């Protein structure tokens, strides 16, 4: 049995998802005015005033650690929300799987806590 006809709608979607952005960028390239880059275009924007100082600032690593921990637990929330919405229909096995998922994330949180990733000092 050849299953390719079952995937026709998927291939059409894939084709349209590829063609529409290329078409939009091409039309924009041909219709947009051709402006040259002046010195104003090359400066950074700071609330409508002339920029003062260097635009490249180094951030401390602790900001990245907080951001990483936040993203991990934000993704956890995204995964747990659909599960919570269909909790009654899924049964005991889905509940156990969700508990294992949360337990693994708690282990990660304890590890980050013990390593000092959550300390602000």
Swiss-Prot record:
UniProt lists the gene as: ndhC
Name recorded for this polypeptide: NAD(P)H-quinone oxidoreductase subunit 3, chloroplastic
Enumerate the Gene Ontology biological process terms.
photosynthesis, light reaction
Q: Which reaction does it catalyse?
A: a plastoquinone + NADH + (n+1) H(+)(in) = a plastoquinol + NAD(+) + n H(+)(out); a plastoquinone + NADPH + (n+1) H(+)(in) = a plastoquinol + NADP(+) + n H(+)(out)
Organism (species): Physcomitrium patens (Spreading-leaved earth moss)
What the entry lists under Pfam families is as follows: Oxidored_q4
Q: What's in the GO CC field?
A: chloroplast thylakoid membrane; NADH dehydrogenase complex
- EC number from the UniProt entry: 7.1.1.-
In which family does this protein belong, per the annotation? Belongs to the complex I subunit 3 family.
Give the GO molecular function terms. NADH dehydrogenase (ubiquinone) activity; quinone binding
Entries under InterPro entries matching the protein: NAD(P)H_OxRDtase_bac/plastid (IPR023043), NADH_UbQ/plastoQ_OxRdtase_su3 (IPR000440), NDAH_ubi_oxred_su3_sf (IPR038430)
The lineage's top-level taxon is: Eukaryota
Question: What task does this protein carry out?
Answer: NDH shuttles electrons from NAD(P)H:plastoquinone, via FMN and iron-sulfur (Fe-S) centers, to quinones in the photosynthetic chain and possibly in a chloroplast respiratory chain. The immediate electron acceptor for the enzyme in this species is believed to be plastoquinone. Couples the redox reaction to proton translocation, and thus conserves the redox energy in a proton gradient.
Locate the transmembrane regions by residue number: 10-30, 65-85, 90-110
PANTHER family per the record?
NADH-UBIQUINONE OXIDOREDUCTASE CHAIN 3
Compartment(s) where it occurs, according to its Swiss-Prot or TrEMBL record: Plastid, Chloroplast thylakoid membrane
Q: Which UniProt keywords apply?
A: Chloroplast, Membrane, NAD, NADP, Plastid, Plastoquinone, Quinone, Thylakoid, Translocase, Transmembrane, Transmembrane helix, Transport
């Amino acid at each position: 049995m050849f299953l390719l006809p079952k995937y026709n709608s998927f291939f059409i979607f894939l084709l349209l998802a590829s063609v529409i952005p290329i078409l939009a960028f091409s039309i924009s390239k041909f219709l947009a005015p051709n402006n040259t880059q002046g010195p104003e275009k090359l400066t950074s924007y700071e609330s409508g005033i002339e920029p003062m100082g260097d635009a490249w600032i180094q951030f401390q690593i602790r900001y990245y650690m907080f951001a990483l921990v936040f993203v991990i637990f934000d993704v956890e929330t995204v995964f747990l929300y659909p599960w919570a919405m269909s909790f009654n229909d899924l049964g005991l096995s889905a509940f156990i799987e969700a508990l294992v998922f949360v337990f693994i994330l708690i282990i990660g949180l304890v590890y980050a806590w013990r390593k000092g990733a959550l300390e602000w000092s």
